[in-house]
Amino acid sequence: MNNHSYLKKNSFHEGDARELLKCIEEESIALSVWSPPYHVGKKYEEGQTYEQWSSLLTKVIALHYPILKPGGFLVINIDDILAFPDPRMPRFQAVNLKKHRVSVTREDILNALKLEPELTKYQLAKKFNCSEQTIERRLKGNNIRGGKYNVQTKVKLAGPVLEKAAEEAGLYLYDRRIWAKDPAWQNSQWHSNSYKAVSEFEHLYIFWKPGETVIDRNKLSKEEWASWASRGIWYIPSVRKNDDHEAKFPLLLPQRLIKLLTQKGDTVLDCFMGSGTTAVAALSESRNFIGIEKEPKYIQLSNKNVETFYISRNKEASKIKETNHSVTDEKKKAEQLELLLEENENSL
């Protein structure tokens, strides 16, 4: 591929990561950090099977080897336990007693049918003072998490898929961090229909491409090394508002990874860019970025967020400039006053 065909830095590129990653200059990426589809009920994940998901991740990871610098890193942020639709999975029968508006049980109905086998569900409903739907649910066991018509979900671990795909690509697990976030779905009906824990943390799988890695302990302060850079658990609050994108991670997350694993002037990649958070983090730390995103509306959102960053930074620079001018003016006034006092003293 000639130089003019490479994806432009500090730009967002619309398309499928499996195609556009082939258009990045070889050994030009110091860090790739991204979060793939999570399979936690988001609209854009609907209908994707476990096999399709693992195939997507395997292909994307494989395409990273040529473009990463030797000694560079790939970081994948992901919830390690994911749920996928699987028609072979037995249905989970969740009888939620709290939601029963009437006290009639399956045993009550069966006992009534023993005495009067000819009773219809409508007659049973009248007998127990409930709806015929309640009779049907009790008899047929339709108290099922996910609904009686939806395909049941199967829980899978993400980590083994990522590690296997990375090793096949020539990348090796270097480290793993835990992002401790706010508990998710605390007020959700899903939570009330399960004994499962709400999601309170995610993993950061850090993979390394063999080669020379620069270790510079001076690029972070002693406080940064002590509080997070050398720690396995990062306590970072979740994004408070996901009104413009369903799965945003906080700015501080890619910011820390960029500060820790790259140098100023390096290029950072996010091939599932979403709302542009990684791009803003890269720019804020004096790095370049390349963003890939298949949804046009999120390309627009990313551009908007980068524009907002530049406006904010320019305002900050103007304030600093004004402050410096003010300090300079005050210094000049002080020097002039000191000179006048000295002249006055000499004249006495």
Curated annotation (Swiss-Prot):
Protein name listed in UniProt: Type II methyltransferase M.BglI
EC number: 2.1.1.113
GO molecular function: DNA binding; N-methyltransferase activity; site-specific DNA-methyltransferase (cytosine-N4-specific) activity
Gene name of this polypeptide: bglIM
Protein origin, superkingdom: Bacteria
InterPro entries per UniProt: DNA_methylase_N4/N6, RM_Methyltransferase, SAM-dependent_MTases_sf, WH-like_DNA-bd_sf
Keywords: DNA-binding, Methyltransferase, Restriction system, S-adenosyl-L-methionine, Transferase
Family: Belongs to the N(4)/N(6)-methyltransferase family.
Pfam families associated with the record: N6_N4_Mtase
GO annotation terms (biological process): DNA restriction-modification system; methylation
Catalytic activity annotation: a 2'-deoxycytidine in DNA + S-adenosyl-L-methionine = an N(4)-methyl-2'-deoxycytidine in DNA + S-adenosyl-L-homocysteine + H(+)
